[in-house]
Amino acid sequence: MFIGINAQIFDALKDVAKKKVTEKATNLVGENVKNAVTQEAITTNFKDCDTQNIKSPEFASDKTFKTLCSADFTEKGYVLTPGYYEIELKSFCLKAGTYAPSKGDGYLYAPLKGPKKEIVSKLVKNWYNHPEIEQNDVQALLWAIIAKASFKNLSTDLQLVAAKLLSPKDILALNKMGLDFVPSGVMSDLKSSLPKPVQLVLEAENKMRQLFSSSNYNYSELEKYAMLAGFNTEKSSIAYGTWGLHPSGFWVSYHPSGYSHMKVRIYVPETAGTVYYIPSNDVAVPANTSSQRLMLSDVKDCR
């Protein structure tokens, strides 16, 4: 009799232990999925900006700016002596699920940061030497990386573009990364406790992953998920056109027109002497977290 009771107790204890192990494994899998979904490929944000050294948008409003549209771009960048300059460049969106730039958003310089910063930097920098590649194709690749899309799910055309701009080692790294579309029910659970702006970003990234995994999508569909409809109504703490001190010793003011075009104004003070400016080292970051981070390219877009 005691043997039978002990056996029942032992079986019950085994069931409890098995249930706990199963729950622990389930929680671990859930936590891993949450980490994979919520980890940002590019982490650059407004906290990376120097908000102490700024000048009013009205600074240098009475000055004449020398255009760099016909200037030579060298390995060191644009060679600038003391004075006032401006250049128009092609730029890229580095954050999906956000509002497009508007006159209400002020931008400051920040460095490129995050787990995928090297691959993102190479894509944009190497594009300068491949004028045959469309800007939209580079942007689509950037969105794929930012959305943490599985490289194997990308179209053959995009994979070929990546092969032109990246090394075999980089391609191998991309092959190892990425997620598939996460079912809506799972996504709802993952993002339920997160701030609304973060939820919108994660939802946009997930929808973009779904598009990349389909065989039939176009750029405008990707763009629709990357951009929130309307304008950001949140008042920016930094005015449009505000000047910020660049780490290279000059002052810079960003004037985006949409996410794909950027006018940059530069002031090189006498104390800085000769400086070198490489636009693709810059990320223009808005004070509003719901607006788009913009990465500059070295490709001119003079109009």
PLM features: what roles do these ranges have?
Residues 7-8:
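Boundary of Sec targeting at the N-terminus
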Residues 12-17:
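Extended, helix-rich scaffolding/adaptor regions
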Residues 163-303:
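Long, low-hydrophobicity ectodomains and other hydrophilic envelope-associated domains
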